[in-house]
Structure formats: structure tokens, C-alpha cells
């Protein structure tokens, strides 16, 4: 996906037989989904929403209205994007859009050792996480919290990471007190 496209929402399941669909908005105010102009899908088609009720919309694709349930079903999980330049500029140097993090270097807080590069920002509703691609090709997921990512420096092109410490899990076959729990030790 291009950094010039910003994901604002997704088309959900159809509603009724006349082409209406449920729409999930990733904006703070769902009405903002249409405030920035025409939306696009990943194929580049222009999508216009006509809100009918809370989270329910009629859809027009490239000027053609969706008028039946079958056509609406084919749109399920279609992601809705806008062009980056349609967003207002950030007002404060400490503000940024999550897409601005993609491509930044990820370094450790302790000694600024290079961990890798932010490849993607994931947000599934419970909080964002950064996918960091390491030089060996393996990825690392870090929760995007102030504790785990205390420094975001867009101008310097980096984020500083303080990875969460992993808890010591009990040895398989033993509980926390060291007693045999009936499992087989590997």
C-alpha cells in the first residue's frame, strides 16, 4: 500500500436487499469518513458514501450506484482510502499521522542499537502496534504505547523502542511452584 493512501474505513456486511452496507469508520467521528472528499479502494475505484443511518450507507462506485444485495456482498471487506494530501496538516510538531511512522528507523532506548525499520502500523481496535522489520528478515511487533515507544522523532527519522520484558513462563509440566502438574516435560 502506498504511503500516499490513508485507510479511513472498511465496508462491512450488506443490509437488506437494496444495496445498503454497514460501514466501519476508523475516524474519531464517523461522519469524517466523507469529509475529506472521494474515497478510493485498493483498485483505485472512486467510492462515494451516502449515509442513511448510523453506520449504514448507500454506495456509489465510479458513478454507478450499488442497488442490490449481491453487488453489496461483493464489497464486503473493501478498504476505504483517501489521498494523504486531503488530510489537514498536523498543527504541532509532536503530532503525526500513524502512516508517518512507516519507514522510520527503530532503535533501542538503552543504547540506540538499530533494531530495524518500521514496516507497518497495525490497529485492530485494541491499540496500535508497530511491525518492525529486522535485517535478517524477521519481524518484531511492538505495542505502540508511550512505555514501549517513548520517543517518536519524525524529523530525525526514528523511533526509540523500550521493548516489553517477557515474563518467565513455568517449565512445561511444572506449575509456578515447581510442582508436577501432570504434563509431560519436553
Curated annotation (Swiss-Prot):
Positions of the PRC barrel domain: 93-168
Gene this protein is translated from: rimM
Compartment(s): Cytoplasm
Similarity comment: Belongs to the RimM family.
GO cellular component, one term: ribosome
Quaternary context: Binds ribosomal protein uS19.
Comp. bias (Basic and acidic residues): 173-186
Protein name: Ribosome maturation factor RimM
Gene source species: Granulibacter bethesdensis (strain ATCC BAA-1260 / CGDNIH1)
Keywords: Chaperone, Cytoplasm, Ribosome biogenesis, rRNA processing
Function: An accessory protein needed during the final step in the assembly of 30S ribosomal subunit, possibly for assembly of the head region. Essential for efficient processing of 16S rRNA. May be needed both before and after RbfA during the maturation of 16S rRNA. It has affinity for free ribosomal 30S subunits but not for 70S ribosomes.
Pfam families associated with the record: PRC_RimM (PF24986), RimM (PF01782)
Primary residence: cytoplasm
Domain free text: The PRC barrel domain binds ribosomal protein uS19.
Gene Ontology MF terms: ribosome binding
Disordered: region residues: 163-186
Domain of life: Bacteria
InterPro entries: PRC_barrel-like_sf (IPR011033), PRC_RimM (IPR056792), RimM (IPR011961), RimM_N (IPR002676), RimM_N_sf (IPR036976), Transl_B-barrel_sf (IPR009000)
GO biological processes: ribosomal small subunit biogenesis; rRNA processing
Amino acid at each position: 500500500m502506498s504511503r500516499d493512501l490513508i485507510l479511513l474505513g472498511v465496508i462491512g456486511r450488506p443490509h437488506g436487499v437494496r444495496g445498503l452496507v454497514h460501514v466501519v469508520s476508523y475516524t474519531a467521528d464517523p461522519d469524517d469518513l466523507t469529509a475529506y472528499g472521494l474515497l478510493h479502494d485498493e483498485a483505485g475505484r472512486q467510492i462515494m458514501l451516502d449515509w442513511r443511518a448510523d453506520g449504514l450507507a448507500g454506495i456509489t462506485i465510479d458513478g454507478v450506484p450499488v442497488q442490490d444485495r449481491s453487488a453489496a456482498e461483493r464489497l464486503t471487506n473493501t478498504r476505504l482510502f483517501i489521498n494523504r494530501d486531503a488530510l489537514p496538516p498536523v498543527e504541532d510538531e509532536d503530532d503525526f499521522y500513524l502512516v508517518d511512522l512507516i519507514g522510520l528507523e527503530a532503535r533501542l532506548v538503552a543504547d540506540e542499537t538499530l533494531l530495524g525499520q518500521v514496516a507497518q502500523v497495525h490497529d485492530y481496535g485494541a491499540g496500535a502496534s508497530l511491525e518492525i522489520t529486522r535485517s535478517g528478515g524477521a519481524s518484531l511487533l511492538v505495542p505502540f504505547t508511550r512505555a514501549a515507544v517513548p520517543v517518536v522523532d519524525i524529523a530525525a527519522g526514528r523511533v526509540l523502542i523500550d521493548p516489553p520484558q517477557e515474563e518467565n513462563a513455568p517449565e512445561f509440566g511444572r506449575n509456578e511452584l515447581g510442582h508436577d502438574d501432570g504434563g509431560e516435560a519436553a
